[in-house]
Amino acid sequence: MNASQRVRVAVVFGGRSNEHAISCVSAGSILRNLDPRRFEVVAIGITPQGSWVLTDGDPAALAISDRQLPEVTSASGTELALPADPGRSGQLVSLPPGASEVLASVDVVFPVLHGPYGEDGTIQGLLELAGVPYVGAGVFASAAGMDKEFTKKLFAAEGLPIGDYAVLRPSQSTLSLQDRERLGLPVFVKPARGGSSIGVSRVSSWDELDAAVAAARDHDPKVIVEAAIAGRELECGVLEMPDGTVQASTVGEIRVAGVRGREDSFYDFATKYLDDTAELDVPAKVDDEIADAVRELAIRAFKAVDCQGLARVDFFLTETGPVLNEINTMPGFTTISMYPRMWAASGVDYPSLLATMVETALTRGVGLR
C-alpha cells in the first residue's frame, strides 16, 4: 500500500472532563501503535476549555513524566474546528470559521476521550452530524455506558447479575434510612458519570457518607452509591469485527489488596496511573469454566447496551459467580491498560487491534444503523 492509499485517521484526545490527562496518555500509546504503512494520522487535542487544536502528534508529549500529567493547551498547535456539515465530511478547518482554510481532511475519527464531553455521546453526536465515521460506540451506547445508573438498568433488564445500588440526584443530599439498611456497609460513593476512579470514596461508617457525597459532587451532581461486593476484580475486552461478529478476550485480573499499606485500598486513580502498585494478571488465574462465563457475560453486556466497536467489561468474581460492575465504551489505552493487554494475550497485537477498530468503523459508516 502506498502513501496515497493510507486511511487518514484523526486521533482526538484530551477534552473537558477530569480524565483529560488519561485521555492524552491513551492517545500517546495509540499514536505509537497505529501502523504508519496503513494509516496517515492527524492528532487533534481538545483543551480543558474545549478548544480543538491540531498538534504535531508527538507521543512523548502525551506521557506521564515524574508524576506530572500531560495537558493540551492552546499553545499545543493550531486551533481548528469540525464543521457539522455532511457536505464537508472529514474536513477540519481553521479558526475563525469565516476563514475556512482546510487544515486537514480525514476518513475516520478515533475519539480517544474518557469521561463526560467525549465518551458520553457528545462527540459521537457531533461526528454523526458532520457525517464522519468514528471508532467505538454510537450516541446511545456511549451515553448509557457513561451513566452508571442506566448501565445497571440495562443490565438488569437483560437479566444480567449486578450489585445493589442507590442514586442520589442533585436535589437529594443523602441516603434514606431504608437505602442505608438495604445497602449495608461498606459502600462505594461515585460520580454517576465518570471514570478512572476520580471522585470515588469507600465509606465504612455512615458518618463518612456526607464527605464522600461532597467529593463525588465535585465531579458530577448525580451520585451513585454501590454496596461493596466481596470478590476478585476481573476484566474482559470485547471487540466487534468488521463483519459485525463480536469476540471476547482473555480474562484479566486486578489485585489491589493492601496497596499503600491499607487493607481497605481499592483501584483508585493513584494506584492506576501514578503509584504502579496494583498487580495485573493476564490471563487471570481462574478456572476455564469461570473464564468462559465471564466472556459470555461480557458479550451479553456489550449487546445489552447496544455497544459497537469495542468495550471493556468489569466484574467482581464472588462465591456465587461473576457479578457485573460496569462497561467502558472507550477503555484506557495507556501502556498499563488492561484492554490492549488482554487482547495481546488473546493473540491480537496492539497494531492489529487498532487496525480492526478502524476497519470496523469504516465498514459501519455513518447514519442510522
Swiss-Prot record:
Chain residues that bind Mg(2+) 2: 326, 328
Biological processes annotated in GO: cell wall organization; peptidoglycan biosynthetic process; regulation of cell shape
Keywords for this protein: ATP-binding, Cell shape, Cell wall biogenesis/degradation, Cytoplasm, Ligase, Magnesium, Manganese, Metal-binding, Nucleotide-binding, Peptidoglycan synthesis
Binding site for ATP: 180-235
Metal-binding keyword on record: yes
Localization in the cell: Cytoplasm
HAMAP family: Dala_Dala_lig
Superkingdom as given in the UniProt entry: Bacteria
Gene Ontology CC, one term: cytosol
Domain ATP-grasp: residue ranges: 152-359
Known role: Cell wall formation.
Family the UniProt entry places it in: Belongs to the D-alanine--D-alanine ligase family.
TM stretches of this protein: none
Gene Ontology molecular function: any one: ATP binding
Lineage, highest ranks first: Bacteria, Bacillati, Actinomycetota, Actinomycetes, Mycobacteriales
InterPro entries on file: ATP-grasp (IPR011761), ATP_grasp_subdomain_1 (IPR013815), D-Ala_lig_Van_CS (IPR000291), D_ala_D_ala (IPR005905), Dala_Dala_lig_C (IPR011095), Dala_Dala_lig_N (IPR011127), PreATP-grasp_dom_sf (IPR016185)
Cofactor note as given: Binds 2 magnesium or manganese ions per subunit.
UniProt binding sites for Mg(2+) 1: 314, 326
Pfam family, one: Dala_Dala_lig_N
Catalytic activity field: 2 D-alanine + ATP = D-alanyl-D-alanine + ADP + phosphate + H(+)
Pathway annotation from the record: Cell wall biogenesis; peptidoglycan biosynthesis
Signal peptide: none
The protein's name: D-alanine--D-alanine ligase
NCBIfam families: D_ala_D_alaTIGR, PRK01372.1, PRK01966.1-4
EC number: 6.3.2.4
Cofactor(s) of this protein: Mg(2+); Mn(2+)
